[in-house]
């Protein structure tokens, strides 16, 4: 198999691009580095294309390894024919390789192997040959043997039937045909174990859908319902068509002595051996594809959450709401340093006196520290906390304080972690959580990288998936996001640094330790003095780490040190000095380069690299998050009972799933925009219309107070 050619066709790119990317990956370069600094080599393949390429490369290389193992095993048995070798080498999937290997795989003791041990294989051959002119019972008498444990004719025939059934089951062509036919024409159904039991799986108590039409989220829901023992799930195959096909392939002659017994064997082989195995394989394949789809959606949601724009330059009060144990508060300054923490008790069980005391405490903190924004976690008691905050803000209108509801998913996981304990050794879990909720609005990326991505909770059935596959995909998303933004080498935490291209957890800690011991970095080259950070790691990481106010102005940009010579020569040619970079004097630089091709040749670099350098010098360390929608800051409160059909509101997309999106409209119950209500045009997936963090206009089309459900529509509102 030509792996490069296969990937080229799948990704719909040029062969040279794939060859270059594979070479760079094999040389130990990271995806963010290749995507950002090797555009010339790959023809500007982006991080998403490179990750898809890497995933397929890994799968296809594993497939080739498996083929080589299988070929060696069959060859060692002396059973490898040219035709079989060609079939194995041409196989496109691991499943087909397994099908072809099945007859030669060392077998555990089965009914067929026991029958072979009893000397019944020749009888099976006679029946399968279909040439005998005697009744099979007569042929079987010759194989009755007390010594071999074959007591009578019936036992001899049963053993021969078992051998034939296994042979039919081992035939790769049959399995491939049956799997394809079942996938094409079969269905999956589910029934309730107890129809009286109420559960979230009630729509699956009597459910059936064709396999080819089954949506990924339904497959994952069926799996979970089955795992939790609410439903029974089965694959319904086109059995009559399958048996007709098998009979036609197995029964070659119309022999009245063998045809009846072979029909029985064919049915037994399918129902006992082939059918259950194919059912398992189909469900496993459907689950894999559903997981891949869900992981893709989870990754997109996570990326949008990580790439939310920071609300910089504000003193923020983080509010972690709770009932009985009180609301934990933490004030952090504009750099994220915690200035003060306390606990207030304005939520149930409470009194007017406690509510007044809470308001006074918060007003005092606002006055003392110059708080201009309150970040409220969206968990338990958020609604009640919000009401107290709104009432209090009305008492101090001159302060111009606003509040924002912040997704607190994962904050409790972080606050109880070893990392949080090291960061805030003198705080309790609640105070750490409040500080995290405050910092999340100041710099969402820097705060969210401290939490296991799975705990951030913007996925679908994430806990039911292959955790290794999920972890790898989400780590890739975090890595790409961190490197897109880049970090300040002198302020970034170890949690942030470990996601930078080429940096491991150990090296991230070493960078922080070096900083603490030697003071701030003044030059990117200083990174080479950090323990375990060698030339290769430096090449991979340097461009993503910036130094403000260092010795070299280019260190404050995303220009890679390998291009400093070219960047300096460019500035000189256009009449600028390096200091003009940090002074912001290079706006409009792109218009001064009249001929990029000629200039690139003069500088000895590629044209794409030159364009990237110019873009970076024009606007150094540009933050891609600036283009994302800003969070909605509020000063008043709306309740679910205030909603009326037809109302148009602004909301924030909190989660995107296969069948729609949940939108926070400020009433503490996210509303659902079904995929059919997103846009007038047809879309296959909600991600074509919205992403997590988007600010959208929605119309209320239904409110169910009893079930606490809000139905929303975006049709005709978002141009």
Language model features by range: what are they?
Residues 1-19, 26:
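Generic start-of-chain signal for non-secretory N-termini
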Residues 3, 55, 61-80, 89, ...:
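Long, highly charged, low-complexity intrinsically disordered interaction regions
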Residues 37-39, 128, 238, 321, ...:
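Short, ordered loop/turn segments at secondary-structure junctions
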Residues 49-51, 59, 63-73, 77-318, ...:
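Duplex nucleic acid-engaging cores and interfaces of nucleic-acid transaction enzymes
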Residues 73, 87-90, 98-100, 225-238, ...:
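Structured, non-catalytic alpha/beta "coupling" segments that mediate domain-domain communication
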Residues 180-187, 319-323, 379-381, 405-413, ...:
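A glycine-rich phosphate-binding loop feature that marks nucleotide/adenosyl-phosphate handling sites
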Residues 550-551, 555-719:
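Single-stranded RNA-binding regions, centering on S1/OB-family and related RNA-binding modules
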